[in-house]
């Protein structure tokens, strides 16, 4: 994938979130609940799952990256079947959900209820990290 303007299968989720609970509760949810749960899911093509907090600690960003559309779909399915489906909205308000990459039509159907902003790949490169 180390070529300029070559299509790739990588899908990225970017969640922009407002915090509902206290900063301590949110950090605990990120570190002790959400991250360990996803880390231990059987999702071999999930390649990134990282939380970020704004400097004022009033908003958060969650970035998830997958090798392909099928892996991104599996993450949504696992989320929907987990305890996180109820706990996530207790901690965060989704301000924006952006999906980057070329997703399959079955994935578009899954994302319809999420009000996702779908953005297909146009140009650039992905060198990856060794």
What are these regions (language model features)?
Residues 1-60, 67-78, 90-130:
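Short S/T/G/P-rich N-terminal loop/turn motif that feeds into the first structured element of a domain
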Residues 80-86:
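A short, acidic, amphipathic alpha-helical segment used as a generic capping/interface helix at domain edges
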């Amino acid at each position: 994938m180390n070529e300029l303007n070559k299509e790739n299968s990588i899908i990225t989720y970017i969640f922009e979130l407002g915090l509902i609970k206290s900063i301590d509760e949110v950090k605990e949810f990120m570190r002790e609940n959400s991250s360990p749960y996803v880390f231990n899911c059987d999702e071999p093509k999930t390649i990134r799952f990282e939380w970020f907090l704004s400097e004022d600690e009033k908003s958060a960003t969650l970035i998830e990256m997958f090798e392909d559309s099928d892996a991104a779909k599996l993450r949504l399915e696992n989320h929907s079947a987990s305890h996180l489906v109820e706990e996530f909205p207790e901690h965060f308000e989704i301000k924006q959900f952006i999906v980057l990459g070329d997703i399959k039509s079955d994935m578009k159907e899954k994302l319809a209820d999420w009000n996702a902003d779908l953005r297909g790949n146009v140009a650039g490169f992905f060198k990856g990290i060794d």
